[in-house]
Amino acid sequence: MFSGKQTKPTFKSYLPPLQTDLKKSPQLPIKKLEAKLLPGEIVVNEANFVRKCIGADSGQDDLWGKLVCTNFKVSFISHNSLPQQRFQCTHRLLGEHDIPLACVEQVVTVNDVKGKQKILGSNQKLKFNPTELILYCKDFRIIRFRFDEAGPESAKKVCLAIAHYSHPADPQLLFGFEYVGKRYHGSAGERVNGVDPGGGLQTPLFDCSSDWDREIKRTGASEWRVCTINQGYFISPSLPEFFVVPVSLADQDLKQYACCFYSQRIPLWCWNHPSGSALVRMSNISDPQQQRKVEQRISSAITKSHPLRSDVFKSDLDKNLPNIQDIQAALLKLRQICVIESFEESEEKWLSSLESSRWMEYVRTFLRHAVEVVYMLESRHVSVILLEKEDRDLSCVISSLVQLMCDPHCRSLHGFQALIQKEWVMAGHRFLDRCNHLKKSDKEELWNQYPAAFEFTEVYLTVLGDSMWVPVFSTFLFNCPRQRAEHSRDFASSKSIHLGQDQALRFPPVWDWSQQFSLKDQTLFNNPLYVGKIATCLQNGTVKTFTHRRSKKNYSSTVRGLPSLMRNGSLGPNDTLTRRNSLVLRLRSDLSQVREQPETPSERFVRDFFSRAVDLQGLLLPQLLPSHLSVWKLYFLRWVPEAQIPHGGPVTAFHKLSVLTDEIEMLQNQLRQYKGAAGTANTSHAEHSKMYFKATSTPQQCPAPPGYLSSSFPFSPVGNLCRPGILGTPLSKFLNGAKIWLSTETLANETI
């Protein structure tokens, strides 16, 4: 993203042919159009009389206005606006037609008169006057602007500015530095961990020893301690200043062994199982002569930390998982097939194209390996070391998945944010270089199979992914804590910013969601299905916790093999096909006879898990057969009109469950008021409700589903994928937007 070398084209354009009878600009009222700027944001270049393509080929829905490039975003200020929808969630940092520069993947300029096109990179020249600008975005949107009435020189300058500022060569050129320098300097003491005091649970940032101490106590890791030898980043440049190590390892030993590890990344404690088994991650040992000695010392220390003194299992991730280059190549192919060409043509080859991308295969591989690690911790009661050359990519994925499967705390909103902060941000994942996607897709698979076990929704995961392209948060802006500290100090020094008691600029974390959304909009993150420890119900006057019982029918989807009475795919002459439930029993009894290889202990562990009722506050294992995995449609296909279901999809169940949950909360409040509970008489239920969709004051009147609901809710594929905000769309807009995909043309195959 910030490398000096320009990346090769990664997108194909699937847009209608250029129009020869373009409409002229209508007679618009003269009014001053100004972009709304954030603190530290400045206008770099702009062009007037620009047409933004919205949907239909006729262009009747297109918008006219000013195209502005700032040091933060591409902003389009329109003379007129699309009809206001009944549903409107407002992003506090971005307007309706704003695109963060960090979200721009490619900038394509076109001159339809000369038949020229060019993919612009940073500091490149443009030898023709563009008549059209196409922006390919990392969130799968495609944005088109026409310069038919704009000045040729201003059109060229704004295109060059967008290409230049969307690919900065220095991280300090990111808008976040100017934003923090202007807005957050001098706010020390007013915020704690990026959250206003009194604002509820705070997400630990793990940048101090107290956060790690609390995590040790929470997991019961009594034989582990907080290590401070990396304060000032003197030992390892990519490790945090505070991390957890075995009690039996002295600081002097760690300093001595650090030089033997790749990038001096000594072993890091991740999590402790209730049995005492520990999950540890570490980089490879770079010194072959010291490898045996150091491995024995580390393994011995981890063994001593286990109450049963169990052995240590080493899991080599580099040998068992695809590398980061393969994952990025799969993501690139997935992007190309998600930007649908002709819907009729792509529908026929969708499954084969998806399979050839290998994306779902890689997702399944990561899930399977995480299950194997869970087996070692849960069934074998041994500690596990995750080995990776640099310990900054694959380890982040596996350690997070293991904790999501084993620890119900990580499936709460607060716990999940702490997990990402601990295993990705503080562990030194290269967000600046990678802008990784796999972590979200794997976790979405778990959410999809056990939605009632997670406090957050699919919308939350999608918005969290989109936040990577808003470069004002420390969470996804740097490769490691040291890089953040160094760049912050250098920027403050160059701008003569007095830091006071702070050692560096204090960037807000993404976990302070009030930076982006109102409290009402944040209720879209709350899952009405969540069965947590605090989710209780009243039954016969007593409080009972919600429980979940697994249907025995689900077992049939996990069984492998065929019944022994079937020969060459057919039944014997005297056999009949029994009911599904009895077929399951026959499959179970004959499973051992048809297996070519004996069942491994880990496979038996998985089979036993699915034969029992699932405890949503306990261990969760994912279904791993291909039929159980699915593409994350809300994230990858939300901007494709043909892929949407107006007034349908999972959101219809979400709406009804939200209303039902809100009604239960309302009745509970009324019951407490009836019993005379203190401080509840004047409490407004609507103000404190956790649900976005609320029940009516009279339970007899069930609210009808809103007309703006669709399977892409709360995102909107209006027109030419042009609306980035969380906006609703009526059916008419879907139909208008669908017309843009009927014709195709390739713009990115050639460069000039």
Swiss-Prot record:
Protein name, UniProt field: Myotubularin-related protein 10
Taxonomy, superkingdom: Eukaryota
Keyword Nucleus attached: no
Keywords: Coiled coil
SUPFAM superfamilies linked: (Phosphotyrosine protein) phosphatases II, PH domain-like
Keyword flag tRNA-binding: no
Sequence ranges assigned to domain Myotubularin phosphatase in this UniProt record: 206-636
A cellular-component GO term for this protein: membrane
Family named by the database record: Belongs to the protein-tyrosine phosphatase family. Non-receptor class myotubularin subfamily.
Organism (species): Danio rerio (Zebrafish)
Coiled coil (residue ranges): 652-683
One of the protein's GO biological processes: phosphatidylinositol dephosphorylation
Pfam families: 3-PAP, Myotub-related
InterPro entries (UniProt xref): MTMR10_PH-GRAM, MTMR12-like_C, Myotubularin, Myotubularin-like_Pase_dom, PH-like_dom_sf, Prot-tyrosine_phosphatase-like
A GO MF term: phosphatidylinositol-3-phosphate phosphatase activity
